[in-house]
Each structure stands twice: as C-alpha cells, then as structure tokens.
C-alpha cells in the first residue's frame, strides 16, 4: 500500500547512469513502472520513488540528478538464490548466474561486507551472461557480456503507527 493505494504485484525499475561515485548523486535515469498499473497505482509508485512521501525513498531520490522519463512497460523479473533475469519490453535484458563453490553445491555470497548492496541481506556474487539497454533517445545504450554482477533481495515496508 502506498497512501491507501494497493500496489501489490507491480514493479518499479530504474535504468540509470551514475557519473562517478554512486553516493555523489547526479544520476541520469529513465524509470519504468508495470504497464498494468492503473493511473492511481502509477502515480502512487512514482510519488514514492520521487521522494514526495518522505522516508528512505526520499533519501534515494536525492541521488537522481535527472529523471528523463517515467514510462509504463511490460516488466518481467525473477531471482532465485542469485540467479536472476530482468526484461523490460524490448529495451532492457539481463541475466546472471551466481558463482558457486568448487563442488557446485554452495552459492557464493558476501555478508556484512562493503560490497553488500543491501545491508543485512546476502549479496550474490555472479557473472552476467548479458546486460543490454537500448534507450537511444536518452543516451542510455550499452551491451555487455560476461561481466561481474552483484544482486541482493530487497524489500521495503512501512507500517504506520497510531499516535496516541
């Protein structure tokens, strides 16, 4: 729920370019919201990630120097123990497979590390078979194969508490 609007089952993805140190901000981005979102759901998700509702997402929003567009798109993503896939229409495609121990049984993770992308959650160390972005109208175009990748499970939840 965002401001009384149920956004269950919907996705938000940002495709962005970071010009230097990630914490210095000035990111250039195009944001994508699930194409099946109603207008109210779209607006609620946009408002949250634009920082208009405060909280940790407002801190994140401060890092974006320019959001060039916010678009509806078909978004498909799945992550299972470090193996991940992301598709956004025909403009973004990426897949990654986690590194494993020599016997192949244990997935390589980083915990409580500077390289963990989400504190308290394991970072899955992986190799991306491919990562392609084709957004020429925004000068966001690249295609990589066989590069390193890290991902984490991430959930944010806010529960309003009654003030006595």
Protein language model features and the residues they cover:
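N-terminal ordered "arm"
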Residues: 1-3
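Short, hydrophobic/proline-enriched secondary-structure or compact coil segments at domain edges
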Residues: 31-32, 81-92
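Ordered, amphipathic secondary-structure segments that act as subunit-interaction surfaces
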Residues: 25-63
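A glycine-rich, hydrophobic loop/mini-helix early in the fold
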Residues: 6-28
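Surface-exposed flexible segments
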Residues: 42-53, 92-110
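A short linear-motif detector with a strong N-terminal bias
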Residues: 8-12, 87, 120-121
